[in-house]
Regions:
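Short intrinsically disordered coil segments
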Residues: 10, 120-122, 194-196
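Metzincin-family zinc-dependent endopeptidase catalytic domain
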Residues: 46-159, 171
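The catalytic-center signature of Zn2+-dependent metalloproteases
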Residues: 146-209
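Sec-dependent signal peptide recognition
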Residues: 2-10
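Short loop/turn motifs enriched for small/polar and acidic residues
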Residues: 40, 107-109, 183
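Fold-level signature of zinc-dependent metallopeptidase catalytic domains
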Residues: 31-44
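C-terminal motif of bacterial Sec signal peptides marking the signal peptidase cleavage site
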Residues: 15-16
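Sec-dependent signal peptide cleavage junction
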Residues: 20-29
Length: 209
């Protein structure tokens, strides 16, 4: 916890949000592998945010994690029922500072995407399926929502890691209990996951280089 506090409170980087642009308030050199955490709309509790940061650092000690301010998502991301995860990723792409390597958007708002799932042996396409998170693979942005997690902080932290690893090029994993398993439209696999398989971690480390 002490290391996390120093990461989040040290005045290495000061951020402010103006319109659709994030400005750095310091001219200091931005460290390599800097990840910017942005709270979208209401964000999440500070405890959940801290635990997610700790979990990222446990798995990727070289990461420099910087906590940004709160950002209100534009109405273009909202479909009247949920916020579209793909639209959020496009928005994060637009506001991402060039000086950071990744942006993780964190929200308590409900998010969705178009999903094709197997239901009773048949493929079913759902145009507005509620999800836990979405990340570009590979890419520089991802988003995670705790709306469907029932306050489960461990599931939230694991989902943040899961989507972040997608940005590093890691695909879904078939190994049992790996955090990178496909949720298949349910949060069960994420809740029951216990670790990152060594093959997934190796691919992720290559993505950090």
């Amino acid at each position: 916890m002490k290391n996390l506090i120093s990461i989040l409170t040290a005045s290495v980087l000061l951020l402010c949000c103006t319109g659709n642009t994030i400005h750095f308030g310091s001219s200091d050199e931005i460290p390599a592998n800097t990840v910017l955490l942005l709270e979208l709309n209401k964000g999440v509790s500070q405890q959940q945010l801290s635990e997610a940061c700790n979990f990222l650092k446990e798995n990727f000690p070289a990461l420099k994690i910087v906590k940004g301010g709160k950002v209100q998502l534009p109405s273009s991301c909202y479909n009247g029922k949920r916020y579209r995860a793909d639209s959020i990723l496009r928005y994060l792409d637009q506001i991402k500072p060039d000086s950071v390597s990744k942006v993780i958007g964190i929200t308590s708002s409900d998010i969705s995407s178009t999903r094709t799932l197997i239901r009773k042996g048949k493929k079913m396409t759902y145009p507005d399926y509620g999800i836990l998170g979405l990340g570009r693979r590979p890419g520089t942005v991802c988003v995670v929502s705790n709306h469907r997690m029932g306050g489960n902080a461990a599931t939230f932290s694991k989902t943040v890691l899961h989507e972040f690893m997608h940005t590093l090029g890691v695909r879904h994993c078939t190994h049992e209990k790996c955090i990178m398993q496909d949720g298949n439209g349910s949060g069960k696999n994420m809740r029951e996951s216990t670790h990152v398989h060594k093959e997934c971690l190796a691919i992720a480390m290559e993505g950090l280089d």
